[in-house]
Amino acid sequence: MGSFSIWHWLIVLLIVVMVFGTKKLKNIGSDLGGAVKGFKDGMKDGASTDDSATTSAPAGQVTNNSAAADKTTIDVEAKHKS
């Protein structure tokens, strides 16, 4: 009762093809494929820029030591944002 048989899905597919037509479905498929390809390329580009950023300086490491020489600066880590 909760699952549909293959015949139910074939009837639904036939109705969708009759309503939208094959040309419209082909255009939707190619648009969706282009969007997925663009998303994958974007993720690949984002991963390569993140890798180059992490190799240049590790997160949390201070590269400028002028603050350590200044005795009036207090270095603390905030636990809660008020």
UniProtKB/Swiss-Prot annotation:
One GO location term (cellular component): TAT protein transport complex
Disordered, as annotated region: 46-82
Membrane-traversing stretches: 1-21
Single Gene Ontology BP annotation: protein transport by the Tat complex
Organism field: Acidovorax ebreus (strain TPSY)
Membrane topology: Single-pass membrane protein
Taxonomy, superkingdom: Bacteria
Subcellular location field: Cell inner membrane
Quaternary structure note: The Tat system comprises two distinct complexes: a TatABC complex, containing multiple copies of TatA, TatB and TatC subunits, and a separate TatA complex, containing only TatA subunits. Substrates initially bind to the TatABC complex, which probably triggers association of the separate TatA complex to form the active translocon.
Family: Belongs to the TatA/E family.
Biased composition (Basic and acidic residues): 72-82
Keyword terms, alphabetized: Cell inner membrane, Cell membrane, Membrane, Protein transport, Translocation, Transmembrane, Transmembrane helix, Transport
Biased composition (Polar residues): 49-67
Name by which UniProt lists this protein: Sec-independent protein translocase protein TatA
PANTHER family: SEC-INDEPENDENT PROTEIN TRANSLOCASE PROTEIN TATA (PTHR42982:SF1)
Molecular-function GO terms, alphabetical: protein transmembrane transporter activity
Purpose: Part of the twin-arginine translocation (Tat) system that transports large folded proteins containing a characteristic twin-arginine motif in their signal peptide across membranes. TatA could form the protein-conducting channel of the Tat system.
